Amino acid sequence: NKELDPVQKLFVDKIREYRTKRQTSGGPVDAGPEYQQDLDRELFKLKQMYGKADMNTFPNFTFEDPKFEAVEKPQS
């Protein structure tokens, strides 16, 4: 590996520090209680708007094939 200049080294060190903090906290880093309150409030709004579905799963869609009728073509 090539040697990093001081700015690059500082940047890489901060990224590693952030990753470590995130892994230990198990969620957002440096988020206070107001963050969780805001998140809960916004999720509540979404549930009210979109039918109280689980916001962590992708919805299941069921599509039915259209029914076609056979139509006789007139002979010309």
Swiss-Prot record:
Modified residues (N6-succinyllysine): 52, 67
Keyword Amino-acid biosynthesis listed: no
Subcellular compartments: Mitochondrion; Mitochondrion inner membrane
N6-acetyllysine modification, residue list: 9, 14, 47, 52, 67, 73
Sites bearing Phosphoserine, chain numbering: 76
Single GO biological process annotation from the record: proton motive force-driven ATP synthesis
Molecular-function GO terms, alphabetical: proton transmembrane transporter activity
Record has Ion transport as a keyword: yes
Membrane-traversing stretches: none
Quaternary assembly: Component of the ATP synthase complex composed at least of ATP5F1A/subunit alpha, ATP5F1B/subunit beta, ATP5MC1/subunit c (homooctomer), MT-ATP6/subunit a, MT-ATP8/subunit 8, ATP5ME/subunit e, ATP5MF/subunit f, ATP5MG/subunit g, ATP5MK/subunit k, ATP5MJ/subunit j, ATP5F1C/subunit gamma, ATP5F1D/subunit delta, ATP5F1E/subunit epsilon, ATP5PF/subunit F6, ATP5PB/subunit b, ATP5PD/subunit d, ATP5PO/subunit OSCP.
Chain's role: Subunit F6, of the mitochondrial membrane ATP synthase complex (F(1)F(0) ATP synthase or Complex V) that produces ATP from ADP in the presence of a proton gradient across the membrane which is generated by electron transport complexes of the respiratory chain. ATP synthase complex consist of a soluble F(1) head domain - the catalytic core - and a membrane F(1) domain - the membrane proton channel. These two domains are linked by a central stalk rotating inside the F(1) region and a stationary peripheral stalk.
Protein name: ATP synthase peripheral stalk subunit F6, mitochondrial
